[in-house]
């Protein structure tokens, strides 16, 4: 179904709602553009597992092709220069140096778990915190992104 077709379904249901015809509006949504609940089974990754993926990908952000840094080096700067190179454990942007967002590697599911992607190694790549946040639950096609080659191992 195209985005235009989806918009037309919502438009048709909206017109019915304006006429206070909730039942027909709901029927149109349920029959043509219903919400599908998905059971998500997600595992958590420890630092050793993440590091293995970072090394496999050569510390390259696979969504941008940019180099990323070993997380330890950024934490060294925050330890020595806490005011000039701040880090916040909950990633508050106004309290975390931008280097953490741009250069700290994290892992991401290429095909999001939330949309049916598998929690398997071939669906996991290295990316920056920033690109992981931007990508969220979108697909590469939706964002018009591609996967860049891994770096030297």
What annotation goes with each model-predicted range?
Residues 76, 119-120, 143:
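Single-residue recognition of alpha-helix boundary sites
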Residues 1-52, 58, 65-71:
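A boundary/linker detector
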Residues 68, 131-135, 151:
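A generic secondary-structure signal for well-formed alpha-helical elements
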Residues 58-61, 101-133:
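Short beta-strand-alpha-helix junction that forms the catalytic/metal-binding core
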């Amino acid at each position: 179904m195209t985005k235009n077709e989806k918009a037309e379904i919502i438009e048709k249901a909206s017109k019915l709602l304006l006429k206070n015809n909730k039942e027909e509006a709901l029927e149109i949504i349920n029959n043509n553009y219903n919400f599908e609940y998905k059971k998500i089974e997600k595992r958590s990754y420890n630092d050793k597992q993440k590091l293995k993926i970072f090394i496999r990908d050569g510390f390259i952000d696979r969504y941008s092709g940019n180099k990323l840094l070993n997380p330890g080096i950024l934490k060294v700067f925050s330890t020595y220069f806490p005011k000039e190179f701040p880090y916040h454990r909950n990633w508050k942007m106004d309290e975390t140096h931008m280097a953490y967002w741009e250069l700290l590697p994290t892992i991401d599911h290429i095909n999001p778990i939330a949309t049916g992607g598998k929690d398997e190694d071939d669906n996991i790549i290295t990316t920056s915190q920033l690109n992981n946040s931007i990508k969220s639950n979108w697909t590469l096609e939706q964002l018009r992104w591609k996967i860049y080659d891994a770096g030297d191992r």
